[in-house]
Amino acid sequence: MADLQAVLDSIHAELSPRLGEGKVADYIPELAKVDPNQFGMAIATVDGNIHSVGHADVPFSIQSISKVFMLTLALGKVGESLWNRVGREPSGTAFNSIVQLEREEGIPRNPFVNAGAIAVSDVVLSGHAPREAIGELLRFVRYVADDESITIDDKVARSETQTGFRNFALANFMRAYGNIDHPVEHVLGVYFHQCAVSMSCQQLAKAGLYLAARGTNPITGHSVVSPKRARRINALMLTCGHYDGSGDFAYHVGLPGKSGVGGGILAVAPGIGSIAVWSPGLNKVGNSQLGAVALEMLAARTGWSVFGD
């Protein structure tokens, strides 16, 4: 295996002059306050090593990366029947598109667009009060990261609740089609809080390890999902994890990955490790601009692309 610390150091050095590229997510007021001149990257390998560079210990809002963890929980609750309510195909449209949802009669294209993630939150909410469902997610993230210090940023959750009009529209639209079972306010309470989970690159890389190691956290030995389910979650991350930029990410990076508008990306190198990168400036489709470049550089220098080197 390549000297991963040297690889990370070289990526950081090459990207340092470009810090601040992209545009922070200004439609969520709390995210608009984030300093764009930050960059962190961490790799957690299946043999238990952690390598990091830059602002890798600074917590940030993981936003849509949380959809990976909620999908894992939902599949654990209802299994394959989840796919009666959510599709598995790339969207080709913006992550908060209503047009596609109307055309497909309230069935979201995949669990990583906002509508799909809201439907997944509805599944996790079943049998719970909203506070309990939020607690279940937080316990799960702490479990897979083996870190009890991970928290939810209430300011971010409140900020999203106050400005999330499009998400309210999506949820009400699905409710009208019978694809949301609980009160919309309860479902979105869960959704906004899951997006407000705050983690560092180091914590996030560790949390993703179960997807790199056939469903088991290799550091703790905890079995999280079956190898088959880990493989299928990775497949969805590869095809749908970057909204309408998913094909471009697969082309340039070649790894399963999930982005968030907080500027984070979680990527998985199956059998090798989990990678988290954070740079708040986003490209035009809402993915971290420098984060994607950093992962492309990493894949090129390590040969980790799932399509070969």
Swiss-Prot record:
GO terms for biological process: glutamate biosynthetic process; glutamine catabolic process. Gene3D superfamilies: DD-peptidase/beta-lactamase superfamily. Substrate binds at S64, N114, E160, N167, Y191, Y243, V261. It catalyses: L-glutamine + H2O = L-glutamate + NH4(+). The keyword Hydrolase applies. Its EC number is 3.5.1.2. InterPro entries: Beta-lactam/transpept-like, Glutaminase. Keywords: Hydrolase. SUPFAM superfamilies: beta-lactamase/transpeptidase-like. One of its GO terms (molecular function) is glutaminase activity. HAMAP family: Glutaminase. Belongs to the glutaminase family. Homotetramer. This is Glutaminase. It comes from Rhizobium rhizogenes (strain K84 / ATCC BAA-868) (Agrobacterium radiobacter).
